[in-house]
Amino acid sequence: CWPWFPGQEGGGGLADVLFGHAEPGGRLPTTWPAVLADAPVTRTRPDGGRLDYDEGLHLGHRGWLRHHRTPAYWFGHGLGYTTWRYEELTVPPVTRAGDGLTVRVRVRNTGARAGREVVQVYLARPASALDRPARWLAGYAAVRARPGETVTATVRVPARALRHWSVAEHAWRTEAGPCRVLAGRSAGDVPLAAEVEVVPTASA
């Protein structure tokens, strides 16, 4: 158990979680390597007083995904006292560039006690002509459910999650074409997928 920096009341809070009086709701904001050699920082050394980070867009979990490596714990990973089944992902078939989209994810609490789940939505553009991460976090929502209960998480994906920076135009742009929408528990656990078509507009 890693409580980060919980403050002066951290002991009581941690005890409540360990004894099952409270549901742990935190999710990892980083990726933890299974072996140190998989961490890019181990290959970064200053040269002549200059320190270059050459991962570009492929930082953190994006790098693990790009190189098909499995870390010890993915970005977004977290534990709880119940289990969940991801049942259905609903997305609009089409969205206009600049509009964003609303994603709905149906999940079922399959455990024996009430719980809280952080439903995460990622985007991917495998057919893109641009250098893109394998997938990136676009939004999330927390839901609570009793044992056996099915609930729907509604995640609003903002328009900026679909944009990229155009170096040539010095502006944010939205690439038209198919976009994969994935939903799951972490960057490496996304059991549901769907596709939305991004159509161009004059301003995007």
For each predicted feature, which ranges?
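Intrinsically disordered, low-complexity Pro/Gly/Ser/Thr-rich segments with frequent PxxP/GP/PP motifs
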Residues: A129-V167
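Generic structural detector for well-ordered beta-strands
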Residues: R85, T90, R106, G139-R146, ...
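Terminal connector regions
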Residues: P158-A204
